[in-house]
Amino acid sequence: MKKTARLLLLCICLLLAGCTAQTAPQPIQPEPDTQPEQAVQPARTWQDIQAQLPDVSAMSGFPAAEQAWHPEPIVVHGEEAEYWIDQSESWETARICMRKDGQTASIYAAQDGSLSQLALFDGMLYFAQIGGIYRMPMEGGAAELWIPGGGRFALTGGVIYTWLSEQGFCAIAAQDPEQAVPVWKQEQALTIKQTVPVTGGIVFWLAENEPDPDAGQLWVVLLRNSGQWELLREETGPMPRSIFSDDTNVWFMRETSEGQFLYQIDCKDGAYACLGKLPEAPDGCYSPGTPVLGFQRLLMRYQGIESTMEFYALDDKLTLGEHLLSYGADDSYAIYFLHLFEIQETPQSFYFCGKSEENGLYLVSEIRKSGDRLLREEALQPPV
């Protein structure tokens, strides 16, 4: 009996030992790496150099960007007044005019004719002139040289973006003239060729500082209101003849030996496409509506829709380079012998800039809107 019990106990121990051996965890063998090592190639994208850029929105003293403004507006609107650059006397003279409470006055004059690019922020006017970027109070007064050496610039959210010879492409807080914060300094000097506003940011066309102003490597760069940069396009070739934008797209024209072609860049995903060749009118003017000075949103959106816009040119389209005809609120035609250069749309008005063939002066005309009708038209004239 005892022998049988011992034998049975021995069998049980052997069975338990076997089960333990089967359930013991086995060491995990590392799987061989089947993917070969990939060499990291430096890609020339804006994201690759983004590490060099501080976040503009995180800088102390920088307000959040509200809305991009047109780089060279015809008229700048303040809360109680509107401002514009008048060059009607001659190309050699230019002045800033202000209209407030129906009264017009000249608040700044430049004798060298270099006055350009008017912008408004926090009670101050900013403009470019020979020597740099100036600023002055909105009501007039002494103008101070604020950014020596600054040239073309863009202002959004209280931050001016420009190119300086020593700092390269940089951002400067408009509300603090003592603060200059370089945003990006590349080994090769870049210059701003053009800026256009889009929903949520500004598109900059940057180019290498080549002897030929129309040549060099071009970067189409989007600065969003959050302070983030994106490279939309990089290419080599001549500078586009005209650049303009609508809400979310950048349009530009490029002239080749085969004619002029229209291109589009989608600012949401960077998609790039050539939309085709523009037809050429018998008089040599590209039709329909050749944009030439940056803001042609009105042309692209309302071109040929006569009943909606109630604007006409000689060929029933609003065409730059042609005489401008407008359909008045009293159902009568009004012919303006104005060689049309630029158009700007605001919620209240349309502004037209052109050269009068009657006296050769460069004028700005305003047409106010009332609902779907044209209410009133007047010329923004400098003070006598």
Residue spans for each PLM region:
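Bacterial signal peptide processing site
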Residues: 20-22
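Beta-strand-rich domains and repeat architectures in extracellular enzymes and scaffolds
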Residues: 57-94, 110-117
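C-terminal motif of bacterial Sec signal peptides marking the signal peptidase cleavage site
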Residues: 15-18
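Structural motif
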Residues: 90-97, 132-134, 166-172, 210-221, ...
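Residue position within the beta-strands of beta-propeller blades
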Residues: 84, 127, 161-163, 204-206, ...
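Short loop/turn segments that connect beta-strands within beta-propeller blades
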Residues: 99-103, 137-141, 173-178, 223-227, ...
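Repeated scaffold domains used in trafficking and secretory/extracellular systems
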Residues: 68-77, 113-121, 148-157, 188-199, ...
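A short beta-strand motif characteristic of beta-propeller blades
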Residues: 57-65, 103-109, 141-147, 179-186, ...
